[in-house]
Amino acid sequence: MDFNQGCVSYRSMPFWCVGSPLSDPFGGAVLSRFDSLEIAKIIAWAGREGYIEATSYHDDDLVPWDPEHPEDDLDPSSPAGRKLREIKAVLDDAGVKVHASICSLHGNRLFRDGGLCNPDPAIRRLAAQKVERTLRIGQFFGAKYYVYWVARDGFEVPVVTKWEQVYE
């Protein structure tokens, strides 16, 4: 019996790695940031060359989130809606699948004291809207998985989280 009937796992190149400006705690960025459409084109090239079959992203890697317009992805004429369609067309053309969609609560200063576990109900609502947007974007791209990344969501900073108020 031949078990090697094609790819058994996806080789993936995520948006955040391709778009990294190469900064770390020891120094600032050494590269300029790429636009998400340019990153998609690099990922598509890697797919066409046979290096990868899939990609993943944090929502903010594709289109920045604006708490004043938390459902901008639903408006096809919005900058976010247009950019998402452009990125999808580039990836689809190269046959690159989206493996996982990840919400970047950890990357937004608004959620520094937690997102879904923030003691402030207004902040929790915004975090939920951001997660819902990421789920919609993932569905749009046909993502197989959604990752809830709890980094900096308050659980690892018990000193700033008022646990008795978390679920009020």
Indicate residue ranges for each PLM-predicted region.
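N-terminal pre-domain/capping segments
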Residues: 1-140
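Active-site-proximal loop/short-helix segments
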Residues: 103-114, 143-165
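Active-site cradle of extracellular carbohydrate-active enzymes
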Residues: 168
